[in-house]
Swiss-Prot record:
Similarity annotation: Belongs to the copper transporter (Ctr) (TC 1.A.56) family. SLC31A subfamily.
Variant or mutagenesis effect after changing Y156A: Dramatically affects copper(1+) transport activity
Effect of M154A: Inhibits copper(1+)-induced MAPK activation. Loss of copper(1+)-induced endothelil cell (EC) migration and capillary formation
Glycosylation sites: N15, T27
Protein known as: High affinity copper uptake protein 1
Position of sequence motif Bis-His motif: 5-6
Site description Cleavage, residues in chain: M42, M43
Coiled-coil zones: none
Location of Phosphothreonine modifications: T114
Amino acid sequence: MDHSHHMGMSYMDSNSTMQPSHHHPTTSASHSHGGGDSSMMMMPMTFYFGFKNVELLFSGLVINTAGEMAGAFVAVFLLAMFYEGLKIARESLLRKSQVSIRYNSMPVPGPNGTILMETHKTVGQQMLSFPHLLQTVLHIIQVVISYFLMLIFMTYNGYLCIAVAAGAGTGYFLFSWKKAVVVDITEHCH
């Protein structure tokens, strides 16, 4: 059963380029699923290497030439590098801002019924402090960049996917060499 008339989408074979499919209710036996612009671009679901009609994040940002693809590659590469650098910068800023140290002592049972005092170091910071506000703004920027990189990768354009991976790898190589290898459970992009 052919469902190509649904939502104004047309299906492509392996030799097609992505072109918008125009759905005209007066000339088709299909039905409408809502308002708005009824023309949509069919997103490829396999990796491809091309530079014609490649939308990059926004509908007005369309790559049509090899030069535009090269420029997009460099921009995406730098964005992915910046993302990795931002992660390390945030960690460094967090370590530097944690200067408020408190020592808490509590009794613990010792050998032969004696009581020992155990001291714990607590590092804290205030919610409305400048370092915390800066970390919050940088976190928002990091989340937005990570989603941009994810959406760029989801174009399935091989050149752009390579730019994301190569930029992230280069950024990690350049910025993370001093960092201890620890799994970050708050990672957004990987």
